[in-house]
Amino acid sequence: MSLDNELPNRPRSWKVLLHHVFQIPKAFLDNEEKSQEYTYELMTESPPEKLKNSSDIANFGEEISNRFIIWWKKSRDSDFSKQVPTYFGMTSRHELLERTVWHSTQHIRQLQSLLENLEIKPGEIISNEQMKGLPLTQEIWDEQKM
């Protein structure tokens, strides 16, 4: 299977979805660290040319994860009620962080489902307990079940 293959019933490739899982928190971090406005275009940015295979995407994800850990250590005691501009209007830093978490989580659920359909067991899965409290739908996909 190629990462350029389209997902079932989606106009999106595996590569785009895998990248998007990490691009969402990257957009959040760019907003936090660089005061870059949280735009739809930033959040949905296409994978750069240098991301050619799953290892490249995993490395990108590791980079974002490390950035997040460092950011959180510096920011956890800061004012999360502060308002920030986004493509969907002004919102609190807390709301944007929560939205970042559930948005990426929803796509991870989709990836887990796709892998399950291919009879591939991920090394780690997100459990229902870990998702408790996140505003996620019961359904993994918007439309029909895949």
Language model: regions and residue ranges:
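Short, contiguous alpha-helical
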Residues: 2-47, 83-146
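Amphipathic, heptad-repeat alpha-helices with coiled-coil/zipper character that mediate oligomerization
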Residues: 26, 63-73
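A short, structured beta-strand-centered segment in the mid-to-C-terminal lobe
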Residues: 49-64
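Catalytic cores of extracellular degradative/oxidative enzymes
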Residues: 49-52, 70-84
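Intrinsically disordered, low-complexity segments enriched in polar/charged residues with Gly/Pro
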Residues: 58, 72, 86-88
